[in-house]
């Protein structure tokens, strides 16, 4: 997200402005940086993998399996970086089918190889890791091959594989917002799990795992809608087609809001149906259903949060998108997880309540800022275009 989404958003705006050479420079810089980051991740995480695994919940019983998996998986870091990071440059040009194919191809390869390596060759966890990095390598080859081909306007060119601070600085600044949204998820999980372990024990932690898994599935759908609209917004903003920017955002906003309201209603009315997809133990299902009623209560506002924040990214609004990325999880959610149990007698209820409170406050703030700033952003762009030399 840091390199791919920031670079893809910047590149599509430059394409809209008719500056294809600059867009290709962005792609070249991002490609090389993704390769460097992939190699660096392999080295760094190999050096500190054991304490890192314990930090994220590994125990004496599971550390051996975790180490076996990570020892192999880390060697595929460069493939992950290229497959995921460069995919943004494909979808930002409108090749959504190609972008989707890169994900599906990797998934199919992984599904086919898993039983062969895990059971057929009796490799166990190591086989699962090998299947995963093989699938990621296939996806990476697919993505790179497409971006070197003739169908795409943005092409990977050897002469442009260089690092230029002037090109990368705005890319990284813009990509920081989605990067923080994804990376802070680990901090949120640590805060939730440690608090629930203290106040409710293992059953509460298990219920939280189910609730967060359900929420993650729906969040991916919100992200898909937002990321599908991003290249359209960015290209037309760069091209000066400001009415199209407004129309695209309106469609994104109302479709996201309708979907989030429908998802919230479904989870509140049929929580048992969704919980049973993840676990069938009666004791855990009972507490998870109770928890999901609380946890999903603010979900109806997520459509506002995602559509407004991702549109800020598409418009190149670095500072405000960074603030909004920090707002929901770092500024609101984590402090609420730690503070609410101090003020409510039912402390487990208080921990789960932190999620809807943060969702509603963050979405309300995001929406207010967006609808106040959008007319000013578009008016500034209109004036820039009027005074631009012909």
Task: Enumerate the language-model features and the residues they cover.
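Small-residue-rich hydrophobic transmembrane alpha-helices
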Residues: 1-43, 80-99, 207-271, 302-321
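Short membrane-interface helical motifs at transmembrane helix boundaries
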Residues: 40-72, 262-289
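Helix-terminus/linker motif at the lipid-water interface of multi-pass membrane proteins
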Residues: 53-60, 116-123, 183-213, 217, ...
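Alpha-helical transmembrane segments of multi-pass membrane proteins
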Residues: 60-86, 173, 210, 216, ...
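Interfacial/gating helices of multi-pass transporter permease domains
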Residues: 61-65, 125-126, 167-174, 195-216, ...
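Short runs within selected transmembrane alpha-helices of multi-pass transporters and secretion channels
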Residues: 73-91, 99-107, 128-141, 223-226, ...
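Membrane-interface helix-loop junctions in multi-pass transport and translocation proteins
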Residues: 97, 107-140, 286, 330-364, ...
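Interhelical loop/hinge segments that connect adjacent transmembrane helices in multipass membrane
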Residues: 132, 141-185, 376-390
């Amino acid at each position: 997200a840091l390199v791919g989404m920031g670079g893809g958003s910047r590149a599509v705006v430059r394409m809209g402005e008719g500056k294809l050479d600059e867009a290709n420079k962005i792609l070249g810089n991002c490609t090389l940086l993704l390769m460097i980051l992939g190699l660096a991740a392999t080295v760094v995480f190999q050096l500190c993998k054991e304490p890192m695994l314990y930090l994220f919940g590994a125990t004496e019983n599971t550390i051996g399996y975790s180490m076996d998996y990570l020892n192999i998986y880390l060697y595929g870091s460069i493939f992950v970086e290229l497959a995921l990071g460069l995919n943004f440059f494909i979808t930002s040009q409108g090749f959504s089918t190609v972008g989707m194919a890169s994900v599906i191809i990797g998934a199919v390869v992984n599904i086919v190889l898993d039983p062969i390596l895990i059971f057929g060759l009796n490799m166990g966890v190591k086989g699962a890791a090998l299947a995963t990095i093989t699938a990621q390598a296939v996806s990476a080859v697919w993505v790179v091959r497409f971006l070197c081909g003739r169908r795409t306007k943005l092409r990977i060119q050897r002469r442009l594989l260089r690092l230029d601070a002037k090109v990368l600085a705005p890319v990284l600044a813009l990509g920081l917002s989605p990067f923080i949204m994804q990376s802070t998820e680990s901090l949120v999980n640590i805060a939730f799990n440690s608090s629930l372990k203290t106040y409710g024990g293992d059953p509460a932690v298990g219920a939280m795992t189910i609730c967060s898994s359900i929420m993650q599935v729906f969040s991916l759908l919100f992200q898909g809608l937002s990321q599908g609209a991003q290249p359209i917004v960015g290209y037309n903003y760069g091209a000066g087609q400001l009415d199209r920017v407004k129309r695209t955002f309106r469609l994104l906003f109302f479709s996201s809001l309708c979907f989030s309201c429908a998802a919230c209603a479904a989870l509140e009315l049929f929580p048992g149906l969704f919980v049973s997809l993840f676990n069938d133990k009666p004791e855990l299902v009972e507490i998870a259903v109770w928890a999901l009623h609380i946890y999903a209560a603010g979900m109806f506002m997520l459509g506002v949060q995602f559509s407004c924040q991702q549109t800020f990214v598409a418009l190149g609004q670095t500072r405000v998108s960074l603030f909004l990325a920090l707002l929901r999880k770092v500024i609101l959610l984590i402090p609420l997880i730690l503070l609410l149990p101090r003020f409510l007698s039912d402390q487990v209820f208080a921990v789960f309540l932190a999620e809807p409170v943060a969702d509603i406050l963050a979405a309300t703030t995001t929406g207010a800022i967006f609808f106040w700033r959008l007319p000013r952003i578009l008016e500034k762009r209109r004036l820039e275009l009027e005074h631009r030399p012909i």
